[in-house]
Every structure is written in C-alpha cells, then in structure tokens.
C-alpha cells in the first residue's frame, strides 16, 4: 500500500539527554526518521531536550523544539504546530513514556493526533510486565515464572514461590533502572523498595532466576500487510543475568542450530503479531536453557532500540529509516534497499558473510564506590563494534577499539601461581564485571580446561574454544619470538585479530618492528564491503571493514579526499558532542566537493551511518588501523581535532608517518597540552594563570605545594574529562593522592595548581582561520563555581552576571592565544574570574584546548552559527571572510546547558560534584531571562522543583555569608529551614527562624532520619576536605534515593531558588523562530 496522503505534519519525540541505557543510538534513529519522512514530503516537527544531537539541527526538521520531553510541554507544541500524527518509536523509553502520558491525559484525542508506528495498546502490552506475560501464554510461548507486585508485602509472597536467586524488573524503566538480582532477603527488600520508587507506575516484576541461560535477540521488522523479516539475530556471549546492554554480543548468532534459529524466528514474529506492532522495528529477547533446550521470552521493545542500531550497523539495513516509512503506510516490498543500489527490496532478509562483535565500555574508574558487578541493571556508558571474517578477529579488533589501553587479550595482572589470586580469578569468572573477558583468557593461561571455565562462567563452550585458541597462539609467539615468523604465520595471526602492538608485546619488540616486518612480508589487510546480501549483488555503497584475505573491495577513487577520525566508544568525558562535530565536518566538506572518509567504531552514532560520509571505514582508531586506511585512500588531509582525545593522541605519530594532519598542527596541540611550554607562552603574552608548578616525584610535590599554598588542584598531565583530578586541602591529602595517582601518570609528572575558591568559571569557544582571523563562537558563564569540572557545570550563554568589560577582556585574551598558538579550526579556553573587594575582576587563564570542545553543539544551537562546519572549512583553507562569518552572534534570549548524571544507576556513588567529570549527557533550556532559561533546563533535566516544605541547609564556613540571601528567598516562598549547628547559629544571628538538627555523627534523630521519613523537600549542602565530604556522603546519597532535590554549590542553589517561579510557565519556541530573531 503506498504512503498515506491524509497525514501532512508528523511530530517525532526524541530521547532526551544521554544516560546509561539510552545513548546516541536514538540520535541515529531519530535523524534517520526525520530525513526519511521529509524526503517523502511530510512536514516534520521534532522535540528533544538534548542540544548535542544531530537531530536537533535546524535543517533536520521543519520545526525543531529543544524543550523538556514532558507531556505538558509537548502539549504546548501540539497546540502550536497542529500535527496529524505522532511517531513515538524513535526516542527510546523516554518517547514511549511521553506518548503514553499524552494519550492518558487525553491530549492526543483532544487535538486529533494519531499515534503511528506503535499503537497505545501495543506499547502498553509490551511495557506492562503482567499484560505481556499473559499475552505470551495466549500464544503458547513461555516466560520465566513471575508475578507483578505493587508493594513489598506482595513481592515477598511471590518471592516465596519463585525462590532465590530472584530477578527484579521494574515496569516502564530504562536499561533495567531500579532492577537487580537478589540472593537473600535483605538484598531483595532493598531492590524492591528502590524498584517501586523508580518505576513511574510503581510496580515491579518478581521473576524466577534464569541465570546462566543463553541469551539471544531477534531484530524484527513488520509492515501493515503482515510481512515480517528478521534483520539480524544477536547472541549474547555473557549468559542471562547480565543486562544485554552490558553483555558482549555477537551477530549473527553463532551457537544456534538451524532448527533452533527457525524456532526463535517463528516465535519472534508471533510475538510482534500478538503485541500488535503493525509497522516498524522491534527487538525480542529470548533465554534458552542449555541443559534442556527450554525457551522463554524475556521481553520485547516495541520500538527501535540499542540493539536495532547495532543490527543496522552490523547488516547495513537501515531499520529506523525503513520503520519510519512503514509507519506512514508503505509495505516492505515497496521500499528499496539502498545499499544494494535498489537491486533488492526491503523485504529481502539481510544475510552477512562476516562476524560482528560489540563490547560495552564502562566508567567504573570514575565511580570507585559503585558496585562494579554486572546485573540486570545496565551500567555501561558506551560500546564499540568490530567486524571480521572470524569471531576471533572481530573480538580482538573490538578489544583494541575500546581504548582502555589494551591492545589484545592482555593478562589482568594476577599471579597465576598464587593460590590467593586463583581464588580471585574464580570469583571474577563467576560474578561478572567489566573485565571478565580478560579473566577468561587468564584462566586458560592458568591451565583451566574449557569445561572448568564454563562451569564457573556459563559462557558457551564454542566461544571459550575460540578464546583458548587465541591464548594458545600467544603462548607459541612468546616461545618462538619475532624472528621465527614467516608470511604464512603472520597472516594466520592477523586473521585471528592480532594487532601489531600485541605481537610486539608478546615478542618483546616494538610496534614499528612488527609493522616493518609485515611490510617486508607483504602482509596487508584488504577491505570488504558491507552489502546486506553476502556478496550476492554488487554494492555502490562504500561501507568497509578490514580483514586479511586475498581480494580487496575498497576500489578507492582519485578524488580529493578528507579523512575524519571519529571519537570511538562513548565514555564519560568524551561523548556525542564530538560525534556531532565529526558529522558536521563530513557534511560541510562533502558540500565543498571533497570526498569524505569517516573512520570510527561506535555503532550508536550518526557518524557511522553509511550515508553521512562518502566512505565509511568501521575500524578501531589505533595507529595501525588508521595508517592502513591512509595507505589505501591517500587523503589530502586528515582531521584529528574533532573526535576528542582519541584521534588527538594519534596526531604526532600520524604526522611522523607522513600523514597530512590539517588544521592546528600537532606541534601547537602539544604546546597547549605541555604545561611547562604553555606556561612560558602565557608569560610571554602577559596573561595570568593561577600559581602552579610541576612535580616529578612525591617528595617534590609536597615541597612545592608548601610554596603555592593550599587548597590545590592536582592532576596528571594529558587527561580528558578530569580523570584522576582532585582538590586537596592539606598535606596529608596530597601525600595520599601522590601515592595513588602517580600510577595513573605513567612516569609523566603531577601538576599542582592553586585552587581558586569562589571563582566564576567561563568557557569561550572560537574559530581561527588560516589568516589568523578569529571568530568568537560564544562566551559561556558557568553556574557552579570553579572546581567543578566544566563538563559537569551548568552554563549560560550569554553570561548572566559578568560585566561587559570583563567579557571584552576575555575576548581579547582568547584572540591573542589563538594567534600565538597558530590555531586553524576550533579552540576552547577556560578562565576563572575572582572578584576583588572593590568589585573589579581578576581573570585567570585555566586551560586552552586547540580542538573541538563538548560545548560546540550547545553554542551552535544557541547562536545559530554552525561552528563545526565553519571550522572544518577553515582547515581546508577557506577564510572566515570567504564564508561571510566575521561577527560574533550574541542572542537577546538566554540559553542554559544543564549536565545530566548517572547517579541513580550506580548505587553507592557520592553525587557531589568536583574536578573529575561524571556527567553522561546534557539538556538545554531557553528563556527571555536567565532564571526562566535555567528553570526550563531544570525541567528538561527532570530535576524536581521543590514545593514549600522543610529545607535543610548545611554549608562550609566560607559559604555562610553567601547562603543567606538564598535562605531568605526560600523563607519568602513559604519554606521552613532546618540546619546543622554551625549553619543554624549563623542563620539565627542573621534573623532567620530555623530549627537545629544533628549531623549523622552527632546522634539521632539526625538529618538522614528526616530525609528517610520524607520530611525534607530540598537540601543545600556544601563541604570541603575529604573528611567533611565523607561525613556528609549519606545525606546526598539518601537525597538521591528518596528523590529529594539537592544543591552542592551555593551558585547552583541560588540559580535553582530564583528559577522556581518560572517552572512550567512560558511559551515554547522552535529553533527556527529563535534563529530568525538573530538575523534581524
């Protein structure tokens, strides 16, 4: 049936900020849906609160709203834009929940908006655990034994029937939030209470354990005529009990017999028919008991998901694009498969002749207090995917793509001859953590048999055999040495995925020696195309991966090419913002007539969509892999400054190998990152830095620290995201840090800076062109004080409290720095501003990054100036004048960026902010005043507005004076105040009526008791020094558990309290309307 003609305007809801469980895969699906529907002539309206996405670019939809994804806000957009239909399946759990809210509150009916892609009943049946279970019984499919509970008492009754261990799954949450595995009653009660609190409908499923079973997923697409295809089968290497987002997964499934595969295929299609997913993609998860073959249905997602992004990238079949077209009436046989150049219809099931492995990326190093065991609640922050002709090849490529410093299945560091360490090894095999794969390899080194490892880990023996073979090959290499390797043996090693760097490690040589040998022996990779049909039809799409075979399918052109190196897997400190910049570079340079080549290995992103660039190499971002691609393609320029630290780390080595790195030179990048060289430059320019020094030994650090004075910010050199950075208040603190952190520094020195207390931090983004002209992109004033990592601080553009004179001073300093560093392209500079008693400001330069920064997308959305595109053109030789962009744009409205944190997912983590970055994503709010914009950003970040009740205040001495006006504003709004003794005395002295409450150490009833009893609605708590931070940890943690809004900085508290009156008020503006104001 052809497309519907009764629909004109379609509303798409995005997924909001990047959080654990919902990352940039929804930017990829949403961007695809926008493109597909506009190409069909529909008017598209988009709402998403995340400014770092490609889908919120003003040219992606006819009207783009960067607004909170809340049904009341979306209702305002519906009233204004009058859409005919709403497509809720492209924005993950967030969009589905919002669509259900709109339906339940009668909004869709009131405005005559039709849900397309998934009907309300289908969403309800798939997401409501009890309805789903009943539906499965009706079609003769089994689910694990389970019942739904809405209270702890009921949950305990069900638990008695299903026994321990028990799986707990809250309804309508994302990435298993609030769920877990309980092995005893105490754990069970804790997880149930948390799950009931975090489920929006306050219900949980209490389920029998299927731990250790094999887990499979089917990606299914169905159209309105009931045509169904399986796009891809996915097998989890980790057995049931680990969330599929945290599992290593492999496509296609490797250990299913044909009969079992057909059985799962039939079952998954039956599930879609029963649930009523009429059009679009869904993901169905199964568990199989390896002993009996019993099959159970675990769950299904009636929308595109993380797995469908993986399946799309693994097969080249664009699920989201096809799903969007099916939602408007097309059938699969009417749509063409673009990868085969339209030679096959979309109803032709993809088949692949290679193996794809996905490995998740974790961030436990950022959260040492978090429980690092993997369960049914997702904890990974990103993922990497690799392709190879064998499982071993794709596994080892994925390992080096993870960028955790490992170049293969390296030993974990256990002493395998020690009994104590073998106990640790067995525990690590049994209780999965982020590194289990490496412990499996260690088990084989320790002489374990496959059966022994299986008995502990329940990883299928087929996978274990492959890992054992890799370890055996390593052992032979260690014995024989590099000299014994001939061409045939080297080719065999490369075919099972060994990197040059790993071969060098095992043979005691270096990577250059191995590469030289490989060149002499003429062992080079070839590139194969992803074509969705296992080579049955020719493909014009250049979507490539490397392997060691005979025939190369790369067929490079002789056009002028620019290669863009992506950012690799998402992690804290390096996320979607960098992918956004890479995509913009590809789009701009393609428009300029260059052939664009993207190199990346992150399956979630828009950059790895095969039609973002002319040629896509799905490869790890290591020196070896990049050099091989350069050798085939011969680009005229390679861009390293857009993918964050990942490609920057390669800049010098690429240049040394004759690769044309364009933009700011690796020499200038090094000058900005090398502390001592940079300090000399700052002194030459007559700019001011906080007193600082560099220490190469622990003793030297303690001596120099006495000269600078405490408090200090200490960190290793060369880091991104503030890794291992800390504020220390005493010599004892510094001694402990130097003991622990010098390990991080790999013989590179420790940096000490005087910490500027109560300073305002400012970020400035600029572009410099080849002639040294500079365009100020934006000046952003941070809301949290200096000392909170810039990626974790909210910020406002334009600044809300800085004087015009200070802002002009910042602009002057930035221009001088850019010119002195010979920057071509983007540069980000951070300043701290301290006020003197006479009201004048002192400006301190904190750091300069001559690369894309994480604020680029936010600034671009706020000002309407596409910084990443303009800067990419500067790198290829165009001036700012030639691009007609020479004036800074300062909007008349305010835009506020707010950071989003993963604390709810990571039990036991202290949510206090500091110099180490811990946020996973961001949202943006726009308003006519700073307070209104801040209120909108808080709504978008789902930060509850405290309603009048009792506010708890406990602040460090230097903050007492500054907290007074905030407390007075709270009292004026009808809040009561409780405070700890010191703060209580200060408030009483200043005429504020309040009650005193015990600190936790002072006896009961104390403040945590009040929080647990629901008596506190808002918390202001600032601390300094390790002891005070540790003492007040339980306050912040309980606030998080009980969803009490809290502020850990005075500036944050002031902004929040002043914004309360603007919550839920004001009109909505599309980006197009806002940007039109700027052009006047």
Swiss-Prot record:
Mn(2+) 1 binds at residues 285, 299. Binds 4 Mg(2+) or Mn(2+) ions per subunit. Residues 943-1080 are annotated as: Allosteric domain. Residues 943-1080 form the MGS-like domain. It catalyses: hydrogencarbonate + L-glutamine + 2 ATP + H2O = carbamoyl phosphate + L-glutamate + 2 ADP + phosphate + 2 H(+). Residues 555-942 are annotated as: Carbamoyl phosphate synthetic domain. Residues 133-328, 679-876 form the ATP-grasp domain. GO terms for cellular component: cytoplasm. Pathway: Amino-acid biosynthesis; L-arginine biosynthesis; carbamoyl phosphate from bicarbonate: step 1/1; Pyrimidine metabolism; UMP biosynthesis via de novo pathway; (S)-dihydroorotate from bicarbonate: step 1/3. Residues 404-554 are annotated as: Oligomerization domain. The large subunit is composed of 2 ATP-grasp domains that are involved in binding the 2 ATP molecules needed for carbamoyl phosphate synthesis. The N-terminal ATP-grasp domain (referred to as the carboxyphosphate synthetic component) catalyzes the ATP-dependent phosphorylation of hydrogencarbonate to carboxyphosphate and the subsequent nucleophilic attack by ammonia to form a carbamate intermediate. Large subunit of the glutamine-dependent carbamoyl phosphate synthetase (CPSase). CPSase catalyzes the formation of carbamoyl phosphate from the ammonia moiety of glutamine, carbonate, and phosphate donated by ATP, constituting the first step of 2 biosynthetic pathways, one leading to arginine and/or urea and the other to pyrimidine nucleotides. NCBIfam families: CPSaseII_lrg (TIGR01369), PRK05294.1 (NF003671), PRK12815.1 (NF009455). Composed of two chains; the small (or glutamine) chain promotes the hydrolysis of glutamine to ammonia, which is used by the large (or ammonia) chain to synthesize carbamoyl phosphate. Tetramer of heterodimers (alpha,beta)4. This is Carbamoyl phosphate synthase large chain. It comes from Xylella fastidiosa (strain Temecula1 / ATCC 700964). The lineage of its organism: Bacteria, Pseudomonadati, Pseudomonadota, Gammaproteobacteria, Lysobacterales.
């Amino acid at each position: 049936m052809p497309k519907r003609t009764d629909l004109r305007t379609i509303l798409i809801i995005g997924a909001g900020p990047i959080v654990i469980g919902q990352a940039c895969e929804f930017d990829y699906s949403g961007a695809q849906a926008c493109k597909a529907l506009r190409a069909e002539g529909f008017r598209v309206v988009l709402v998403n609160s995340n400014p770092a996405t490609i889908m919120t670019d003003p040219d992606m939809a006819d009207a783009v709203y960067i607004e909170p994804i809340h049904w009341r806000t979306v209702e305002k957009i519906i009233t204004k834009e009058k859409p005919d239909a709403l497509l809720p399946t492209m924005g993950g759990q967030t969009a589905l929940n919002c669509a259900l809210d709109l339906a339940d509150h009668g909004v869709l009916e009131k405005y005559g908006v039709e849900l397309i892609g998934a009907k309300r009943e289908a969403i309800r049946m798939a997401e409501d655990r009890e309805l789903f279970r009943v539906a499965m019984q009706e079609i003769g499919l089994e689910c694990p034994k389970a019942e739904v509970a809405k209270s702890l008492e009921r949950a305990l009754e069900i638990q008695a029937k299903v026994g321990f261990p028990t799986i707990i799954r809250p309804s309508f949450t994302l990435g298993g939030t609030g769920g877990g595995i309980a092995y005893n009653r105490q754990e069970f009660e804790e997880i149930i209470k948390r799950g009931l609190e975090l489920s929006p409908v306050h219900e949980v499923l209490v389920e029998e354990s299927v731990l250790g079973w094999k887990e499979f997923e089917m990606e299914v697409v169905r159209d309105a005529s009931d045509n169904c295809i399986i796009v891809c089968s996915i097998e989890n290497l980790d057995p049931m009990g680990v969330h599929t987002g945290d599992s290593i997964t492999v496509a296609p499934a490797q250990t299913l017999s044909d009969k079992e595969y057909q059985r799962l295929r039939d079952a998954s299609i039956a599930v879609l028919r029963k649930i009523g997913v009429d059009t679009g993609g869904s993901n169905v998860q199964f568990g199989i008991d390896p002993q009996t073959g019993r099959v159970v249905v675990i769950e299904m997602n009636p929308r595109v998901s993380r797995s469908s992004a993986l399946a799309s990238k693994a097969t080249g079949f664009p699920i989201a694009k096809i799903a969007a077209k099916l939602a408007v009436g097309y059938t699969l046989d009417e749509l063409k498969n673009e990868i085969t150049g339209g030679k096959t219809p979309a109803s032709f099931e993809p088949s692949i002749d290679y193996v794809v492995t996905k490995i998740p990326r974790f961030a436990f190093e950022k959260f040492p207090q978090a429980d690092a065991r993997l369960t049914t609640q997702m904890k990974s922050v990103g993922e990497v995917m690799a392709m190879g002709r064998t499982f071993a090849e794709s596994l080892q490529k994925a390992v080096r793509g993870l960028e955790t410093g490992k170049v293969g299945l390296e030993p974990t560091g256990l002493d395998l001859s020690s009994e104590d360490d073998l106990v640790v090894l067995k525990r690590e095999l049994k209780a999965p953590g982020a590194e289990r794969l490496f412990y499996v390899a260690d088990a084989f080194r320790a002489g374990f048999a496959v059966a022994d490892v299986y008995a502990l880990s329940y990883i299928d023996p087929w996978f274990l055999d492959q890992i054992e073979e890799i370890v055996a090959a390593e052992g032979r290499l260690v014995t024989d040495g590099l000299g014994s390797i001939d061409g045939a043996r080297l080719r065999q090693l490369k075919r099972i995925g060994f990197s040059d760097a790993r071969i060098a490690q095992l043979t005691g040589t270096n990577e250059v020696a191995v590469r030289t040998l490989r060149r002499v022996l003429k062992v080079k990779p070839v590139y194969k195309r992803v074509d969705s049909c296992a080579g049955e039809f020719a493909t014009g799409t250049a979507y490539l991966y490397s392997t060691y075979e005979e025939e190369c399918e790369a067929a490079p052109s002789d056009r002028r090419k620019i290669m863009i190196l992506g950012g690799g897997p998402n992690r804290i400190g390096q996320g979607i913002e960098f992918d956004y910049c890479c995509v913009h570079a590809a789009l701009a340079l393609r428009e300029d007539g260059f052939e664009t080549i993207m190199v990346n290995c992150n399956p979630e992103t828009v950059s790895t969509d095969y039609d973002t660039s002319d040629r896509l190499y799905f490869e790890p971002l290591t020196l070896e892999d990049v050099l091989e691609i350069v050798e085939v393609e011969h680009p005229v320029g390679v861009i390293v400054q857009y993918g964050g630290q990942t490609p920057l780390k390669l800049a010098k080595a690429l240049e040394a190998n004759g690769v044309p790195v364009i933009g700011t030179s690796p020499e200038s990048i090094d000058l900005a990152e090398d502390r001592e060289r940079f300090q000399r430059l700052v002194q030459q320019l007559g700019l001011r830095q906080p007193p600082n020094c560099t220490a190469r030994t622990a003793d030297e650090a303690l001596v120099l620290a006495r000269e600078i004075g405490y408090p200090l910010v200490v960190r290793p050199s060369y880091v991104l995201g503030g890794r291992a950075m800390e504020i220390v208040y005493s010599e004892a603190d510094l001694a402990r840090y130097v003991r622990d952190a010098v390990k991080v520094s790999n013989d590179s020195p420790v940096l000490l800076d005087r910490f500027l207390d109560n300073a305002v931090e400012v970020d400035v983004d600029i572009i410099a062109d080849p002639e040294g002209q500079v365009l100020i992109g934006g000046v952003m004033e941070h809301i949290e004080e200096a000392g909170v990592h810039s990626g974790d601080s909210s910020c406002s553009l334009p600044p809300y409290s800085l004087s015009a004179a200070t802002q002009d001073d910042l602009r002057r300093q930035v221009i001088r720095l850019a010119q002195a560093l010979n920057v071509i392209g983007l540069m980000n500079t951070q300043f701290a501003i301290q006020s003197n008693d006479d009201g004048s400001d002192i400006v301190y330069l904190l750091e300069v990054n001559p690369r894309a920064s994480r604020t680029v997308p936010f600034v671009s959305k706020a000002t309407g100036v596409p910084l990443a595109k303009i800067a990419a053109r500067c790198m290829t030789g165009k001036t700012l004048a030639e691009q007609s962009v020479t004036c800074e744009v300062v909007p008349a409205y305010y835009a506020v960026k707010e950071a989003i944190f993963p604390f709810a997912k990571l039990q036991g983590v202290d949510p206090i902010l500091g110099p180490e970055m811990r946020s996973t994503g961001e949202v943006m709010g726009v308003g006519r005043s700073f307070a209104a914009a801040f209120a909108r950003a808080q709504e978008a970040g789902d930060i509850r507005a405290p309603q009048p009740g009792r506010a708890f205040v406990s602040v460090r001495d230097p903050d007492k004076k500054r907290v007074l006006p905030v407390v007075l504003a709270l009292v004026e709004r009808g809040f009561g105040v409780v405070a700890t003794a010191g703060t209580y005395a200060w408030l009483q002295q200043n005429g504020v009526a309040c009650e005193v409450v015990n600190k936790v150490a002072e006896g009961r009833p104390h403040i945590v008791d009040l929080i647990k009893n629901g008596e506190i609605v808002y918390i202001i708590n600032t601390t300094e020094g390790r002891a005070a931070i540790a003492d007040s940890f339980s306050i912040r943690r309980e606030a998080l558990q009980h969803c009490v809004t809290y502020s850990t900085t005075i500036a944050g508290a002031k902004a929040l309290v002043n914004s309360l009156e603007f919550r839920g008020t004001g009109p909505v503006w599309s980006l197009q309307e806002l940007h039109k104001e700027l052009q006047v």
